From Swiss-Prot:
Pfam families: Tetraspanin (PF00335). The keyword Transmembrane applies. PANTHER family: TETRASPANIN, TETRASPANIN-13. The modification Phosphoserine is found at S143. The chain crosses the membrane at residues 20-40, 45-65, 73-93, 168-188. Keywords: Glycoprotein, Membrane, Phosphoprotein, Transmembrane, Transmembrane helix. GO terms for biological process: regulation of calcium ion transmembrane transport. It is found in: Membrane. This is Tetraspanin-13. Residues 1-19, 66-72, 189-204 are cytoplasmic. It is a multi-pass membrane protein. InterPro entries: Tetraspanin/Peripherin, Tetraspanin_animals. Residues 41-44, 94-167 are extracellular. It comes from Homo sapiens (Human).
Length: 204
């Protein structure tokens, strides 16, 4: 049977949504693991990751049920939501890949000033204090404060990894963006195909 057939379209759509389900569970698991082992203390960051995971899980569930049952309404809404997610994710991925070092520094500084718990995590894990300079009046949880060694600012250390992280996130985002547009195309084809097991006189 050619891959344009009903069964092949159904199987491909089910496999794609199973992939999204695994990714969503992985996101939720990583967030829970990070806060469980004390690597992340920011409830805002964990909440965002878990919310994205749950949202992706619900989308995958709608797509999976729609594909198995060949449900026209579910497939329609799944296709629309997936298209909107593709537009947002593709835009964010391109922005991640297009940021230069100066823009990365400005973005990191904004995040540094607005998230106290994440700032404390960075200072503790990277053993640094302050963003661009060390202020002795600020609270710092880095171990270098208790030792005789002087603490370094965090901006140069974060800057070493920021570009690589943004390229990695942008690349992964682009990959999943193309899987989403593939999902939209598969859903459109599958939705307009007739189930060979259905009653030939039934209305699609």
């Amino acid at each position: 049977m050619v891959c344009g057939g009903f069964a092949c379209s159904k199987n491909c759509l089910c496999a794609l949504n199973l992939l999204y389900t695994l990714v969503s569970l992985l996101l939720i698991g990583i967030a829970a693991w990070g806060i469980g082992f004390g690597l992340i203390s920011s409830l805002r960051v964990v909440g965002v990751v878990i919310a994205v995971g749950i949202f992706l899980f619900l989308i995958a569930l709608v797509g999976l049920i729609g594909a198995v049952k060949h449900h026209q309404v579910l497939l329609f809404f799944y296709m629309i939501i997936l298209l909107l997610v593709f537009i947002v994710q593709f835009s964010v991925s391109c922005a991640c890949l297009a940021l230069n070092q100066e823009q990365q520094g400005q973005l990191l500084e904004v995040g540094w000033n607005n998230t106290a718990s994440a700032r404390n995590d960075i200072q503790r894990n990277l053993n640094c204090c302050g963003f661009r300079s060390v202020n002795p009046n600020d609270t710092c949880l880095a171990s270098c404060v208790k030792s005789d060694h002087s603490c370094s600012p965090c901006a140069p250390i974060i800057g070493e990894y920021a570009g690589e992280v943004l390229r990695f996130v942008g690349g992964i985002g682009l990959f999943f963006s193309f899987t989403e547009i593939l999902g939209v195309w598969l859903t459109y084809r599958y939705r307009n195909q007739k189930d060979p097991r259905a009653n030939p006189s039934a209305f699609l």
